Amino acid sequence: MSAAILLAPGDVIKRSSEELKQRQIQINLVDWMESEGGKEDKTEPKEESKAEGSKDGEGTQSESGQKEEGGKETKDADVDRRIHTAVGSGSGTKGSGERANENANRGDGKVGGGGGDADAGVGATGTNGGRWVVLTEEIARAIESKYGTKIDVYRDEVPAQIIEVERSLQKELGISREGVAEQTERLRDLRRKEKNGTHAKAVERGGRKQRKKAHGDAQREGVEEEKTSEEPARIGITIEGVMSQKKLLSMIGGVERKMAPIGARESAVMLVSNSIKDVVRATAYFTAPTGDPHWKEVAREASKKKNILAYTSTGGDVKTEFLHLIDHL
């Protein structure tokens, strides 16, 4: 696509203005506060004009999006149903085995008292090797996407060290309601099992005391050996609630990923605008829930154009999705 002009809601453009300037993209923003008083379109000064030439090797993908004429008026969220392109970029996940292999040598000193290998940790036995795990695939994906650290999902192994992602961190990671509910359900199941396991251990210990009295001192050593050999296998599950990003990173390692902005020469977008005057020359538009009262009319007019690409927010972070779209048009 050459010299693309992208329409978007005014508040989305406002929140992204700094990143747009870094990309040397012009901004034509109609401020709805001022436009109420009859002011005309306000164009923010551009840092550097974008060269208006077509890019080689990339043809315009035209997805015909004309709505049937005769028509019913549509709301913001509906104007682009004819072309619904998911903007967000999900991070693919690998199997838990791969994550386990890659994390085995992390040696951050936070797990099982370990230094290097996972097997070096005190009590770090079983399939999990003593490393921290989470309860859902969604949480594992979110952590990998945000911090670049692969983390296993709990698979009913014992012993286990489980991270419970609490409310403030759930928001930070962008965990969905379904993901939160799934974690809550798994925690309830675990606590129920843990309670039953503790009861079984108490019964077994009582039985050992009776056996010791019955058989006397001669068999005391054998009973003690039995006790010490059986109890490590019954070491239960550690659940650690985590509210802050800092604590999470201290447990799993990694740092927050910050995407470097794509430069002007790498983006096809020349101008972003929320002005109805730019509908005629627009090549694409992005719609999302907005407080811009004029966007409904702009989007409706844009939807009447032939050969215009329509994109909509998938419900995640709107600014991130908007910039991702700009960088990949």
Swiss-Prot record:
Q: What is its EC number?
A: 3.6.4.13
Q: Which domain of life is it from?
A: Viruses
Composition bias of kind Basic and acidic residues appears in 36-58, 65-83, 96-109, 189-207, 215-232
Specify the effect of residue 157 to N: No effect on ATP hydrolysis activity or ATP binding
Reactions catalysed: ATP + H2O = ADP + phosphate + H(+)
Q: Where does ATP bind?
A: 110
Indicate where this protein resides in the cell: Virion
Segments of this protein annotated with the region Disordered? 28-130, 189-232
Top EC category: hydrolase
Q: What's the short name of a Pfam family annotated to this entry?
A: Orbi_VP6
Tell whether Cell wall biogenesis/degradation is among the UniProt keywords.
no
Biased-composition ranges, Gly residues, are: 110-129
Tell me how this protein assembles.
Homohexamer.
Briefly state the protein's biological role.
ATP dependent RNA helicase essential for RNA packaging and viral transcription. Possesses ss- and dsRNA-binding capacity.
The family classification in the record reads: Belongs to the reoviruses VP6 family.
What's this protein's name?
Helicase VP6-A
Q: Which organism is it from?
A: Bluetongue virus 10 (isolate USA) (BTV 10)
Q: Which gene encodes it?
A: Segment-9
